Design a protein with these regions (language model features):
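Membrane-interface transmembrane-helix boundary segments in multi-pass integral membrane proteins
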Residues: 39-43, 73-75, 210-228, 250-289
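Internal transmembrane alpha-helix with an interfacial aromatic "cap," most often the third helix
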Residues: 88-92, 96, 120, 125-132, ...
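Haloarchaeal acidic low-complexity proteome signature biased toward cell-envelope/secretome components but also
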Residues: 1-54, 246-251, 284-310
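Interfacial segments of alpha-helical transmembrane regions
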Residues: 101-112, 165-188
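Short aromatic-rich membrane-water interface segments that cap or initiate transmembrane helices
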Residues: 134-150, 208-224
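Alpha-helical transmembrane segments
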Residues: 40-57, 105-110, 260-262
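Central hydrophobic cores of alpha-helical transmembrane segments in multi-pass inner-membrane proteins
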Residues: 27, 78-93
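Transmembrane alpha-helix/helix-exit interface in multi-pass inner-membrane proteins
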Residues: 114, 118-122, 183-202
Length: 310
């Protein structure tokens, strides 16, 4: 027998009508506009920006800018603008999932990121003694980029999303999910750090010794990344609703475009400097992306390409 509290057919119809006619909240309207913006400019964001970024960073490092354009060399506003644009697909993708719990997790992870980076730049632990050699925007205490979370969080979150897609149901096992994500984070840093050293973003004190045997990066750096990746993966795993994240991944085709940008930007820089192991890892990440069938739109759909054709 039906429960007395169960809604009648008329009540269900009224609720459905109310849902259909409900005015979207301001947040929902902003989210919808951001989704539309990213979809309209996918090729520009995921391909053009990292290509321009790679050329610009190499030109800065090698002194290729003429005097009239020297203001662009390592220009922090230029760098941060490019990074922010390339992050838009990820920001739009996770935006609907940021609730109070996720916000707390991100806040705590931000504190950790600043703290461990300060310890790293002042003591050499856990990444090895290093320093930023160009200002990546405003610096905290003169040693840490204020924009550090914008650089750090996406490395981990992209690895987390790629793991969920590639492993499928196997990612439901916590140990498998966390171990695979940490491994994916290490893979991205095996690409990032040699490229960043090549374009002189930062430098390790061991650069002139055998202990910096991986393209100017000490192997101890990666032990430090195991620690930070584990902390960050746990924060995302606990802070984000995984069921909602999987659903968003299914409906949001551009959610991993930031990883596409990463592969093009840092894979390209490493290729220009002949860092072939990082290039091979970047290619492997690209193959992983292709197997997820996430980047299959027609180039002609890009707003930039349509504008050029006019």
């Amino acid at each position: 027998m039906a429960s007395e509290d169960a809604p009648t057919a008329d009540q269900q119809e009224s609720r459905s009508l109310a849902d259909a006619t409900r005015r979207p909240s301001a947040r929902e309207q902003v989210q919808a506009r951001l989704d539309e913006l990213v979809r309209e400019h996918r090729f520009t964001i995921a391909v053009v920006f990292p290509l321009v970024g790679a050329i610009s960073l190499v030109a800065s490092a090698e002194g290729w800018y003429p005097d009239s354009l020297s203001f662009l060399a390592y220009n922090p506003l230029f760098v941060l603008f490019g990074v922010f644009v390339m992050r838009l697909p990820l920001i739009a993708g996770v935006g609907p999932l940021i609730d109070r719990k996720a916000g707390i997790a991100l806040a705590l992870l931000t504190v950790y990121a600043y703290g461990i980076e300060y310890v790293g730049t002042t003591t050499g632990w856990p990444y090895g003694a290093f320093e930023y050699t160009v200002p990546l925007g405003p610096m905290l205490a003169g040693v840490i980029p204020v924009a550090l979370p914008v650089f750090f969080f996406p490395l981990v979150l992209n690895a987390y999303l790629l793991t969920l897609l590639l492993l499928g149901d196997r990612a439901d096992n916590t140990a498998v999910r966390l171990a695979a994500t940490v491994g994916a984070v290490l893979a991205t840093d095996l690409v990032l750090d040699p490229g960043a050293v090549a374009v002189k973003f930062w430098a390790y004190e061991c650069a002139a010794t055998a202990s910096c045997g991986y393209y100017g990066v000490p192997w101890s750096n990666y032990a430090g990344w195991v620690l930070s990746a584990t902390v960050a993966v746990l924060a995302f795993d606990q802070g984000l609703d995984r069921t909602g994240l999987k659903a968003r991944l299914r409906e949001c085709e551009f959610m991993l475009d930031d990883l596409v940008s990463f592969v093009i930007l840092w894979g390209g820089i490493n290729a220009l400097y002949g860092n072939w192991i990082p290039v091979a890892i970047a290619v492997a990440l690209g193959v992983g992306l292709l197997t997820t069938d996430r980047f299959d739109f027609a180039i002609g759909d890009s707003a930039l390409v349509r504008a050029v054709r006019r």
